[in-house]
Amino acid sequence: EGSVRRVGNRVRITGQLINTANDHHLWAEKFDRDIEDIFAVQDEVATAIANVLRIKLSDEEVMLISSSQTESIEAYDLYIKGRSFSYSYSAPNIYKAINYFNEAIKIDPNYALPYAGIARSKTTLSFTQAHDDTFIKKILTEVELHAEKAIALGPKEAEAQFTMGYYLNRQSDESAYEYLKKAIELNPSHAHAHDEIGDYYLDSHGNLDEALYWFEKALKLDPDLAPAGFLRIYTTLKKGQANNALVLVDDGLKRHPNVPFYSTIKHAALMMAGKYHDAYKFMKTQESLYQTSRVEMLDFYFGLGQSLIMLNKFDEIDNILEKLKKIKYYDQTHEYRYLTNLRLYYEGDYRSAINGFNAFDNSVVLVFMNNLRPVLSDICHYWKAKSYLELGEFENAIDELNQFRPNFIGLSYNLVFDEFWPKRNYLKGLAYEGMGDNRSAQESYEKFLKDWSDADDDLLEIMDAKERLRKLKQAS
């Protein structure tokens, strides 16, 4: 454990080493130095800890610990300032971070870490402008160049390897994994690299348990790492655990009260739990958080709209739709069209809902990651299947449900929260029952309950599937 305090040109570093098995203090030290001595203190602290542990560091380990990548205190200071702003997850602060990194590069053009900082910051920035194709192509080209430069200047810098992995993960590129693993080999305490491997398992492979393992490892290393905390909640919710997700998200909001995606996932958790009024009230209190980018404003009105539809407040939806129409690219994104068609379903106009979702699925829709388009198609298939069930057209419902993607991949938190994939077999069960095929209905309910085996017992679909399965088994 330790802390760093700076006053003017003086810095105080305190450190202590504790045996976690018995809480026994093994070592403690205080270092008061001029800021110009900061790199020497870094070496001194590392060596002191190694001596207490009676570890003999290899030459490579000494080099890695001692490496500052720059002899310039000013460049180092600018990098640290930029890094602080880059993890605030707001577009204005990310631009500030990029400015600090560029200033550091002007002072020391061979300093690898600011290049990595720019690449990581611009990758994050690409999510905030997700609907501007020209901007995305330009910024991701810049990301790749800066990530390559960082690795060329600092091949043994964990942050450089991580940044390339972060960029490739953004592209859903399988090679991301090797860069992220290399980052962890170079720095086993790199929390964000652990988080990004969790992202890799969740986004590209749909392995929820493996993803959770890595998110939790990341949070042990850094409990305040915003993306790891968020993605742990998101994955928990994808497992159907709304109650657990709500506990986690309240802790996350205490740590990150000004990060909009925590508010977005709380709204999703309340909606899954059937607390539609609470979801609406909560989003109304968060409006000021969603004003810094177009993507955030779309998220805000989209959340309000979903809540209003589930509360049957159809007369208030027109106002939400009008607000969405004032946001650039509204006609090329999913929010306006999804809400329009969802409203048709809940108003009982099932044929129009089918036609609307079909047209929506066959149109151009801007999404911020390539593998999200199939997620959106599945959601359209889901609502078309629900509509066909209401119309008693069971074979058409089955046909829609058979078109789902084969596994639960894709991070859909900036799209529509994807709880639909496991529910496809629940709807199949309803359709087969409607057709009188009780054996297929039973198999479908069993598959649904297996897919969502960790889900809350009080979710409506879980309770209904169990009851229907019980009756089918009794009848057979």
Role assignments for model-derived ranges:
Residues E1-Y100:
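Catalytic-center loop of serine/cysteine hydrolases
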Residues I80, G117, T163, E196, ...:
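"A position-specific structural signal for the A-helix of alpha-solenoid helical repeats
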Residues R83, R120, Y166, D199-Y200, ...:
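Residue-level recognition of tetratricopeptide repeat
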Residues N93-N99, T128-K149, R170-K182, D203-K217, ...:
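Structural signature of tandem alpha-helical TPR/SEL1-like repeats
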Residues K106, E185, K220, K254, ...:
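Amphipathic alpha-helical segments of tetratricopeptide repeats
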Residues P109, P155, P188, P223, ...:
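Short coil turns that delineate tetratricopeptide repeat
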